[in-house]
Curated annotation (Swiss-Prot):
Protein name: Translocating chain-associated membrane protein 1
Subcellular location: Endoplasmic reticulum membrane
Annotated membrane topology: Multi-pass membrane protein
Source species taxonomy: Eukaryota, Metazoa, Chordata, Craniata, Vertebrata
Residue positions where Phosphoserine is found in the record: S365
Organism: Bos taurus (Bovine)
Family recorded in the similarity comment: Belongs to the TRAM family.
Length: 374
């Protein structure tokens, strides 16, 4: 049995190709340094800032909750360290999904380079959207958002968060920050980088805005709603790559996308335009995290409306492009002539008829004239 040669040589250490091929292992080593730091008293004080959530407050038990105290959290500058650590975790999870799930499917399906990159993108995002949607829904149910929608604006500012709420926002920020180095690790094309930067920037802008302005209740509801619609799109695209005749998922996504934009505007106007506008405390106070002033409310609504308009504009262009491609694909099939059978009778029909009708010249052929004369 012949010895199989290696497909590629090992690149030099710390070279460009070495970092791309082994970035998950390198990041894992960096993350392990923070975890090992927890084992020693000297470094534990620094490592704990990166690994665990900071700024916790213990509220004493009340008469309604006489059994246990409540542990709540607020945000601060140390959250950047926590976001950095979980950004490393997101890079590791991204590499695991890519290597053990998506790459195996790609080898079986034999996609082209264009489909390969789009399949990887949809595979990663569909996993993230599904996980975030389930996690966010669990928080909504556990904190009674569904049974009492007024919690979106009641008792603002919402500067104190539960562990699940704060960890959710930290994870969201970490994931979208990890998308920046992934542009380098995944060898994203130069023409696709501007689109990706706008895409990532919009997520970070709105998630960080909801987190810093203490609009975490509204932000959570809108994220779950948006993630569900986006999950449906990317899972439909995955099915489309396996079977190009599959279109049902896109049709359902198109309807839910429009409804999602409408619900986003309704909830935003209801919360910011009516709920917070009628609140008694409308003074800017950084110490308590109260940003319920007219200028901030207008800025929040304007940013949401502009983003929704931008998404609808992209959606309309996407649908028009799909319709043009679909009509262009069907046009040759409509114009295509039926196959002509070879034979003497078919040639006579072609020569003597137009659109299936016999002409006068055909009826008065030389043979017919000979029969008449006889």
């Amino acid at each position: 049995m012949a010895i199989r040669k290696k497909s590629s040589k090992n690149p030099p250490v710390l070279s460009h190709e070495f970092v791309l091929q082994n970035h998950a292992d390198i990041v894992s080593c960096v993350a392990m340094v923070f975890l090992l730091g927890l084992m020693f008293e000297i470094t534990a004080k620094v490592s704990i800032i990166f690994v665990t959530l900071q700024y916790n407050v213990t509220l004493p038990a009340t008469e309604e909750q006489a059994t246990e105290s409540a542990f709540l959290y607020y945000y601060g500058i140390k959250d950047l360290a926590t976001v950095f650590f979980y950004m490393l975790v997101a890079i590791i999870i991204h590499a695991i999904i890519q290597e053990y799930v998506l790459d195996k499917i790609n080898r079986r399906m034999h996609f082209s380079k264009t489909k390969h990159s789009k399949f990887n993108e949809s595979g990663q995002l569909s996993a993230f959207y599904l996980f975030s949607c389930i996690w966010g829904t669990f928080i909504l149910i556990s904190e009674n958002y569904i049974s009492d929608p007024t919690i979106l604006w009641r008792a603002y500012p919402h500067n104190l968060m539960t562990f699940q709420m704060k960890f959710f926002y930290i994870s969201q920020l970490a994931y979208w920050f990890h998308a920046f180095p992934e542009l380098y690790f995944q060898k994203t094309k130069k023409e696709d980088i501007p689109r990706q930067l706008v895409y990532i920037g919009l997520y970070l802008f709105h998630i960080a805005g909801a987190y810093l302005l203490n609009l975490n209740h509204l932000g959570l509801v809108l994220l779950v709603l948006h993630y569900f619609v986006e999950f449906l799109f990317h899972i439909s695209r995955l099915f489309y790559f396996s079977d190009e005749k599959y279109q049902k998922g896109f049709s359902l996504w198109a309807v839910l996308f429009v409804l999602g934009r409408l619900l986003t505007l309704i909830l935003s106007v209801l919360t910011v335009g009516f709920g917070l506008a009628r609140a008694e405390n409308q003074k800017l106070d950084f110490s308590t995290g109260n940003f319920n002033v007219l200028a901030v409310r207008i800025a929040v609504l304007a940013s949401i409306c502009i983003t929704q308009a931008f998404m609808m504009w992209k959606f309309i262009n996407f649908q028009l492009r799909r319709w043009r491609e679909h009509s262009a694909f069907q046009a040759p099939a409509v114009k295509k002539k039926p196959p002509v059978t070879k034979g003497r009778s078919s040639r006579k029909g072609t020569e003597n008829g137009v659109n299936g009708t016999v002409t006068s010249n055909g009826a008065d052929s030389p043979r017919n004239r000979k029969e008449k004369s006889s």
